[in-house]
Amino acid sequence: RMAARHESDGTDESELPSTLRMQRERKALLAAGAAAFNHKPKDGIAYLAQQALLAPSGRERARSIARFLKDSPLVDKRLLGDYISRAENVDVLAEYMDMFDFGDCDVAEAMRALCEAFRLPGEAQQIARITETFARKYFASKPPGIRSEDAVYVLAYSIIMLNTDLHNPQVTRRMTTADYQRNLRGVNAVSYTHLRAHETREDL
């Protein structure tokens, strides 16, 4: 004889079908929101707001947008990177970055985790915005041997530039170890050989 109440979570079994139905409906709405976002990001966010899937305002709204972008596997990674790095979305970028845990990572590993989540935009200002936010988040985790937030910024930006230099077929003159070390003089450096062997992303 089946119990009237699910032992593990206390859910009334008579309510379970409606709960599952609501979960399916929510999943379908999130998928539709991702599809709309992939067509035009602003439309996707507006759709999610219309469906009451986002907090109404303030930091909670930015966090709910960031959570959607972080959790949805259907969101286009290129559009995601472009969206969070725009000047008008810096609050979403900050909340999105806060959803990563870089505590046990060196800078190169942390950057790799970040760049697996979305594609970096091509515009220098947008890359700088992401790098600044990353540096603030990473330095807040109190990494050993890192002297300042600025050092994280320079190092992270250099990793992006070096990765592009080493793995972009359009670059004819590759950066040497000496070039890389010269660019990072006085900054905590990541091994050139380590970066040469491991791309930050497959097609940065």
Place the predicted regions along the sequence by residue.
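Extended coiled-coil/helical scaffold and S/T/P-rich low-complexity linker segments
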Residues: 1-64, 131, 137, 152
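Hydrophobic/aromatic-rich, well-ordered segments within soluble, folded domains that form packed cores
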Residues: 43, 47, 53-54, 104-120, ...
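Amphipathic alpha-helical interaction motifs in eukaryotic regulatory proteins
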Residues: 45-50, 66, 70, 94-97, ...
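Internal amphipathic alpha-helical repeat/solenoid segments
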Residues: 58-73, 89-103
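Amphipathic alpha-helical interface segments within eukaryotic helical scaffold
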Residues: 79-141
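Conserved small/polar residues in nucleotide/adenosyl-binding loops
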Residues: 193-200
